[in-house]
């Protein structure tokens, strides 16, 4: 059995990092809304559904010409938003099949909710800096390194993982 550990930390970003975090959240919201509109369009025109991978490939093709500002954010923000959209449609169709009343995925509005985005760490780009000894970020302890954003200070002290022990 593989156990996944998750930690939740509150960030203490500077002004520039706040702007970058807002851009990531905006790109995720845009990708979700674009994907939802595209999903509906494909279903109405072709009578089939699509998936997150197909939408992400199409968004990447359009990025160069139509959405060059998306190069300012990590590739993970829009990709994870499209995965969330696919999961929303899976939940919608599963609910319809079982007879439950389930709402159709809705467009995300800019001012209706707290801005958020997710990043994937399968490539190991997100790292906790605990002791300030990282050669790429000297002297930065109590920080987390996020792709395209850099080392962001944490408000609280991170938990150190004990070797061979229980946390």
Regions found by a protein language model. Give the residues of each.
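Nucleic-acid substrate recognition interfaces
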Residues: 1-167
């Amino acid at each position: 059995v593989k156990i996944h550990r998750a930690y939740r930390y509150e960030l203490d970003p500077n002004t520039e990092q706040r702007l970058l975090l807002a851009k990531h959240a905006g790109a995720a919201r845009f990708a979700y809304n674009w994907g939802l509109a595209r999903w509906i369009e494909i279903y109405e025109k072709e009578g089939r559904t699509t998936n997150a991978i197909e939408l992400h490939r199409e968004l990447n093709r359009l990025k160069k010409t139509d959405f060059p500002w998306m190069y300012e954010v990590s590739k993970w923000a829009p990709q994870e938003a499209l995965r969330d959209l696919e999961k929303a449609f899976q939940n919608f169709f599963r609910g319809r099949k079982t007879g439950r009343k389930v709402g159709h995925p809705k467009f995300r509005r800019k001012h209706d909710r707290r801005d958020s985005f997710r990043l994937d760490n399968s490539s190991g780009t997100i790292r906790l800096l605990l002791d300030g000894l990282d050669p790429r970020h000297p002297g930065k302890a109590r920080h987390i390194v996020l792709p395209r954003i850099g080392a962001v200070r944490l408000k609280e002290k991170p938990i150190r993982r004990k070797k061979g022990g229980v946390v």
